[in-house]
């Protein structure tokens, strides 16, 4: 297309070669321009000398003069694949900057020709740093700082709340002046009529408030339905029945055979706990869905929580006792006896963190049963075959207890939280009791696993 290019043109002396040096090279046309008479369609090609061939990375091309991002791209790419090393005697070093003024001077972005595959300057998406792009929205009603778009208009929290209250309560305002009051950040509360009218003029939508209220109502109804479903699946009535079924008979407290009792409070407590283990299994069988679990999981749950379950029971039973605890056998263990037996510190914790708190809030039997059921359904017990099922049952008890407290004690909105706060104390005291061998005679020489397994396999005895 360019005729016969059998020779390459001469390089001028200023490029490091010897004067008049002539060399025939194998450099590609992208690096060196050939000589010879061009075709008529390319009149710009002449036999006059032109500047020496240069690689892209060797000269101050418009790309390199622009800096980031092109400099990063070209430096990462390296020299073009078509650029070859100069032959011996030719030094392809960039000429002084004075010789590149024509190359480096760029009058506009249109003069810049990017590399193939790279976008032009006009097409580059640079982050906007103009002052206008950093301006935050202001409230369209009063000019205060906007907290976002509310009911279709950028507005502050004050105007948002004012508009919502007006719509929800269907309020009607009047203006004392000419219905043209100035509404700005300082005077927005002076005239409610003009403020409301400006909300409407600026585009706030009444229907947006009504739709928001409808969504809130639907969400509340949905949550209520879910909670109701949980309550039906874990009725508090059955939990209360389980507590009442295993409650020691009050009249039996006075019939305790004194000859069988000892002066050692630890022995008395262990004896009472041994008796209570049988009723503990009966109680667990009456808790909804406990018997639906595998026999192995039932054993694991009782083994993990028996100490906390028994401590919760005698603590609640002792709320009417002065400075002591009442055992299921009818015996009273006083603080002085516990201190003399060397278990005073843990005994004091039971009285302070459990008995006293239960007494102050007047915890009833239903709440006690729910707390014990939460302890029973422990998904963290080691060895469970289906922890997720146990966790689901615990969550159902949570929902049942919360609904019960809201319905039974509406004047105490924090009661549910107060009840749950007793669980960490119960857990800590239970672990401390084991650490001190508080119930060291509980099972004697019988391993607890086989002991509980034998009781669980016994049919439920209705009393």
Swiss-Prot record:
Region (Disordered): 16-53, 211-232
GO biological process: positive regulation of transcription by RNA polymerase II; retinoic acid receptor signaling pathway
Post-translational changes noted in the entry: Acetylated by EP300.
Superkingdom field: Eukaryota
Zn finger residue spans: NR C4-type: 139-159, 175-199
Null allele phenotype: Knockout mice exhibit memory deficits.
Subunit text: Homodimer. Heterodimer with a RAR molecule. Binds DNA preferentially as a RAR/RXR heterodimer. Interacts with RARA.
Name this protein carries in UniProt: Retinoic acid receptor RXR-gamma
Lineage: Eukaryota, Metazoa, Chordata, Craniata, Vertebrata
Gene it is expressed from: Rxrg
């Amino acid at each position: 297309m360019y005729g016969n290019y059998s020779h390459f043109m001469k390089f001028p002396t200023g490029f490091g070669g010897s004067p008049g040096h002539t060399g025939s090279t194998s450099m590609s046309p992208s690096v060196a321009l050939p000589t010879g008479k061009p075709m008529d369609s390319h009149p710009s090609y002449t036999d006059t000398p032109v500047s020496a061939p240069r690689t892209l990375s060797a000269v101050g091309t418009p790309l390199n003069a622009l800096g980031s991002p092109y400099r990063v791209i070209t430096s990462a790419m390296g020299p073009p694949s078509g650029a070859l090393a100069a032959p011996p005697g030719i030094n392809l070093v960039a000429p002084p900057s004075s010789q590149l003024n024509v190359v480096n001077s760029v009058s506009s972005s249109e003069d810049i020709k990017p590399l193939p595959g790279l976008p032009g300057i006009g097409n580059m998406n640079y982050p906007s740093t103009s002052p206008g792009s950093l301006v935050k929205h202001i409230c369209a009603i009063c000019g205060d700082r906007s907290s976002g778009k509310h009911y279709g208009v950028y507005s502050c929290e004050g105007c948002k709340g004012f508009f919502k209250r007006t719509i929800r309560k269907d309020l009607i305002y009047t203006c004392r002046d000419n219905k043209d009051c100035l509404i700005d950040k300082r005077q927005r509360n002076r005239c409610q009529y003009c403020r409301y009218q400006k909300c409407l003029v600026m585009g706030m939508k009444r229907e947006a408030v009504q739709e928001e209220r409808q969504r809130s109502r639907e969400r509340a109804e949905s949550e209520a339905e879910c909670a109701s479903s949980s309550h039906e699946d874990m009725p508090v009535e059955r939990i209360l029945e389980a507590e009442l079924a295993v409650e020691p008979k009050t009249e039996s407290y006075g019939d305790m055979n004194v000859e069988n009792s000892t002066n050692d409070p630890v022995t008395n407590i262990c004896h009472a706990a041994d008796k209570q283990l049988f009723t503990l299994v009966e109680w667990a069988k009456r808790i909804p869905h406990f018997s639906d679990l595998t026999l192995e999981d039932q054993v694991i749950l009782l083994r993990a929580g028996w100490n906390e379950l028994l401590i919760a029971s005698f603590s609640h039973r002792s709320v009417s006792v002065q400075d002591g605890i009442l055992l299921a056998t009818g015996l009273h263990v006083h603080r002085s006896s516990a201190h003399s037996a060397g278990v005073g510190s843990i005994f004091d914790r039971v009285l302070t963190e459990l008995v006293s708190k239960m007494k102050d809030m007047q915890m009833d039997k239903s709440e006690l049963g729910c707390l014990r059921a939460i302890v029973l359904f422990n998904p963290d017990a080691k060895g469970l075959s289906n922890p997720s099922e146990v966790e689901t049952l615990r969550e159902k008890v949570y929902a049942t207890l919360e609904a019960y407290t809201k319905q039974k004690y509406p004047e105490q909105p924090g009661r549910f939280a107060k009840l749950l706060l007793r669980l960490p104390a119960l857990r800590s005291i239970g672990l401390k009791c084991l650490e001190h061998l508080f119930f060291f005679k509980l099972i004697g020489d019988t391993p607890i696993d086989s002991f509980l397994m034998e009781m669980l396999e016994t049919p439920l005895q209705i009393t």
